Amino acid sequence: MHAVHGLLGQFTPSLPMSREEIESFGFTFRDEYLLPYIHESFLGQVFGPHTEFVKQNFLQTTDVSGIYHMKPGFETQREVENFFSDRKDEDSIWIREGLYSLISNVLFVPDKKEEGKYHPRIGVQRDFIFRSLSEAEKNAFNKLYDQYYYHRHNAFWQQQAMKKLPQLTQSTRMLVCGEDLGMIPDCVASVMNDLRILSLEIQRMPKNPLHEFGHLSE
C-alpha cells in the first residue's frame, strides 16, 4: 500500500471504468490525469514560507514551464511518511501534509486488479487539478463522477450484500444494527429492510438531504 490517505483508495469490490466509458461522458481521458498535478501557481498556497525548500528538496522541473514532478524517493505518500518519521516539529508536519496533498492531486486512480481500468478520485472537486479544467471538462467529469459514486454500483453492491450479510445476521441472536450514515448508495435502505437490520438514526445527521435535522415522526 503506497497511500497514507484514503483519497487514493478504491472500493472493493467495485466496477472500475475503462477509458472508453470515461470518454462516453464527453470527458477526454489523458494519461497525465493519473499523475499528480503540481503547478507553480499554487505551491505558495500549500507550503507558504517553505515553498522554496520544498521545490529544492522534493520536486523536480519538467519540460513544461511551471509544472513539477515529485523527485524519485518521494513519489508516494508512504515514501514521504517514511522520510518524515522522525521529524515531528510543526514545520515538518506542515511540509509532510502538503506533500501528501500534492501526491493525491490526481483525477483518476488506476484499478489495482484490472489494467486499463480507472476510478475517479473521490472528493477531487476540491483540489487544484479539478480547478485547472475548463468549465466543459468540469461538467463532463462531474457527470461521470456522479454516475460512478451514486448509481453505477447500486445493483452490484446489492448483489454482494445479499451474498454476504445473511450469513452474518443468521450467525447471531443479537440485534443487528447497521451504520448507514454519510455517503451510502441507494440500495442500502432496501437491503437493510429486507434483512431486518436496524438503521442508525441521529437527529443531527438526517438521511434526507433537504433537512437540517431529522424529524422523529418520519
Where are each of the predicted segments found?
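Catalytic cores of glycan-processing enzymes that make or break glycosidic bonds
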Residues: 1-218
